[in-house]
């Protein structure tokens, strides 16, 4: 919770984002996109809370998703609570439950 808003974050309390160009259960952020928007990666041994799942990326890795929406970090966020990626190019948004 930040400024009265509830949003998703990783274990280090960094803000997570969703990408409008993704489809449910499918990431469309690779190469240069994934450098700026690192996918939140997971593994098969992870204990996931309700609503979270793992999706397989075309590069073979497992990415954490919430309600089937792949989750990402933003390379310009420097500390917990930063939300500088919200609204970038009109297609990136803070992930919310």
Residue map of PLM features:
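Compact beta-sheet-dominated domain cores in extracellular/mature segments
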Residues: 1-97
């Amino acid at each position: 919770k930040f400024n009265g808003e509830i949003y998703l974050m990783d274990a280090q309390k960094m803000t997570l984002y969703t990408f409008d160009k993704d489809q449910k259960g499918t990431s469309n952020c690779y190469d240069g996109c994934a450098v700026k928007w690192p996918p939140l990666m997971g593994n098969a041994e992870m204990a996931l809370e309700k609503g979270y799942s793992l999706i397989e990326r075309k590069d073979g890795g497992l990415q954490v998703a919430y309600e089937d929406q792949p989750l990402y970090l933003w390379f310009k966020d420097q500390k917990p609570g930063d939300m500088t990626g919200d609204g970038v190019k009109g297609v990136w948004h803070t992930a919310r439950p």
